[in-house]
Curated annotation (Swiss-Prot):
Function: 3'-to-5' exoribonuclease specific for small oligoribonucleotides.
Annotated catalytic residues: 129
Designated name of the protein: Oligoribonuclease
Gene encoding the protein: orn
The species this protein was found in: Tropheryma whipplei (strain TW08/27)
UniProt entry tagged with the keyword Hydrolase: yes
Amino acid sequence: MCVAPTPSHLVWVDCEMTGLNPERDELLEVAVIVTDKDLLPLDEGVNVVVSPSSEALGAMDNYVARMHRVSGLLDELSNGVPVSEAQAMVKEYITKHIKTGGIMSGNSIATDRLFITRYMPDVHAILHYRMIDVSSIKELAVRWAPEIYSGAPNKKGGHRAMADVLESIAELAYYREHFLTGTA
């Protein structure tokens, strides 16, 4: 069986949402950075605050509303752009580096992918079906190498998309150096 090679660049994504259900919750913020295979960012990335519907904002539970209030994100929503404009900005950024087949990467990335699929289908269409989920590597380290897990960088992003993307890249770099060191 011949399998086409995947691009070496990684598309790091983090989304902040009104909740975790893409059928009723909406995007509030999306950040993307493309890195090379060595996890070096190609540039500063793109960060977009999205203007959600009043219904989605009103339906946020207290925990999520408090989280976004503390992070300062709620205060920025009045300057947010429609999701269609956010999608165009994110797609333009990604395709500047990768035309198609980018490997979506991040922490607990499956949830982000559900929201990208629902609200940014043009972005989803240019991503590969494979993903790199740093949280899966973290879970392996917890079980197989707790001493390495205990040295992992602490997260401080405070539920802001760009800070979370940068922390995910740093976390994978740590695990690559300390955990994924086997030789063939």
